[in-house]
Regions:
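Conserved, mostly hydrophobic/aromatic
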Residues: 13, 69, 111, 146
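A conserved active-site cap/scaffold subdomain adjacent to cofactor or substrate pockets
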Residues: 66-78, 82
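Histidine/acidic residue-rich metal-binding segments in metalloenzymes
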Residues: 1-12, 18-38, 51-67, 88-104
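Short, catalytically relevant binding-site loops at active-site mouths
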Residues: 20-21, 43-46, 75-78
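Histidine/acidic-residue-rich catalytic or RNA/ligand-binding cores of hydrolases
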Residues: 23-31, 48-54, 79-91, 112-129, ...
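Mid-to-C-terminal alpha-helical segments outside catalytic/metal-binding sites
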Residues: 123-164
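Short acidic/histidine-rich active-site segments
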Residues: 73, 101-122
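Active-site metal-binding loops of divalent metal-dependent hydrolases
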Residues: 18, 42, 110-112
């Protein structure tokens, strides 16, 4: 009932804190609608098998439904390896999601709320240029892909989802 009402009102539904079962139920309710879901801060299940990370089939579903997944800046969700450094884990997640679902589903989902433990290289929003420089230095991403990740994809979702 709640999900249907949210869809009627044109609200965006965030599945970041949903269990895999709840996410599946939401995808079923959403059906063929587009621009109505996001995962505001998560990782890729194939890289780190945390149940709150999205599985590859979900990433493809996001692409088919014009949704965005924000990459969380927290190693706990991005890698099964305990490390204080995380730029490479952020990029590894970006790369995996792009390869599975395309660059249009990518967004930033830092979760800089004070309760998480971000990588030492990026501890707050003032350090976002570090990930930007890192992505450009790899020469694996186009300007359009990096700009999409840094905000254009999320803005597009907001405009298409809320702008109705």
């Amino acid at each position: 009932k709640v999900v249907n009402r949210m869809l009627e009102l044109g609200m965006l539904i965030d599945v970041a804190h949903c269990t895999p079962k709840a996410r599946s139920e939401i995808y079923e309710i959403v059906g063929s609608r587009k621009n109505c879901l996001l995962a505001s801060h998560t990782g890729a299940f194939e890289i780190n098998r945390d149940p709150y990370n999205l599985e590859d089939w979900e990433l493809k579903w996001f692409a088919d439904h014009d949704c965005v997944t924000g990459i969380i800046f927290m190693n706990y969700w991005l890698s099964p390896v305990d490390s204080p450094l995380g730029l490479k884990y952020i990029e590894q997640t970006i790369s995996h999601i792009r390869d599975v679902a395309g660059a249009n589903v990518l967004g930033i989902g830092t979760d800089f709320d004070g309760f998480t433990d971000p990588p030492d290289e990026i501890t707050d929003m003032s350090e976002i240029p570090r990930i930007t420089r890192y992505l450009y230095s790899l020469k694996r991403y186009s300007d359009e892909e990096i700009e999409g990740f840094l905000g254009k994809n999320s803005i597009q979702l907001l405009m298409n989802g809320w702008g109705k």
